[in-house]
Amino acid sequence: MNFYTENNGATTLENRKLLASRAFNVSSHYDSAIFNYFNQVFEEPVLKISEQNGNVLRYGENPHQKGFFYGDFDKMFTKVHGKELSYNNLLDVDAAVNLMNEFKGDNPTFAILKHNNACGLATRNTMKEAYLDALAGDPTSAFGGVLIANGKIDVATANEINQLFCEVVIAPSYDQEAIDILEEKKNRIILIQNEVELPQTTVRTCLNGVLVQDKDNVTDTKEHLKTVTTAVPTAEEIEDLLFASKICKHTKSNTIVFAKNKQLCASGTGQTSRVDALRQAIEKATSFEFDLTGAVMASDAFFPFPDCVEIANKAGITAVIQPGGSIKDE
């Protein structure tokens, strides 16, 4: 408002254009909110996105790119400590939250993500045990990662986390002493995840437009499973298959996931062939000394040929979960 006082209430054309722009921003946002409310019922094929809260990021995916975040971050998280989140931090946080949402209400579960993919995940009786077994999944990739828990982070867990360099820690709650420990690293970002509903629609740019779809909220359960082999999976194998399937759902395709005793043993991610993803997973499991005997395998798509199952069998895999659909399934 300084230009009013500085000019005795007079305005320039540029001043009025700026104020008009801000006024129409408010009114158009209000109109969009009304339309989107009614369109929940009528589902007209019209997209109206209006976000008032825009934040300038340090840069985009790379330093030479501009970056912005439009949304109400403070509604989803309470930031306790640390530096400003970067464009890449936000992508990892988004991936972490969506993955851990699959384990909401489960026993203590901890995940470590890097470049939007889980490199470690485990469910245990305590959060400390879950963290340590998640870290064991790939301690190399965990460096600089994003950590997330489905329950309170206590002092014992915080002491273990504090030995690792990580960018972000996310949990629904913390012991105060645990926060004090984690704050010892001045740049580490500590977030409390608030109890809010996650978006139910995904949007991404494509060519000169956007693609919109309903969020994939389907999680495999025992009722979804259909055994198509003579051998029937044990109760323990079924638990591991469902566990691996949740991770597989949130990993870049082509992907193969190995799990055993509710621990991510290894994964092959983002490969151009399913065989390559499988070989990568076997190599990683071997490098971190996992015994795959009795482990299970999840695939994010069907197997067009029997080679993956044959290779997995030789590696010790005893049960496989995959969506099916290959013409060679029979």
For each predicted feature, which ranges?
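Internal, active-site/partner-interface "lid" segment
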Residues: 1-40
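ATP-dependent carboxylate/acyl-activation modules
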Residues: 29-32, 36-330
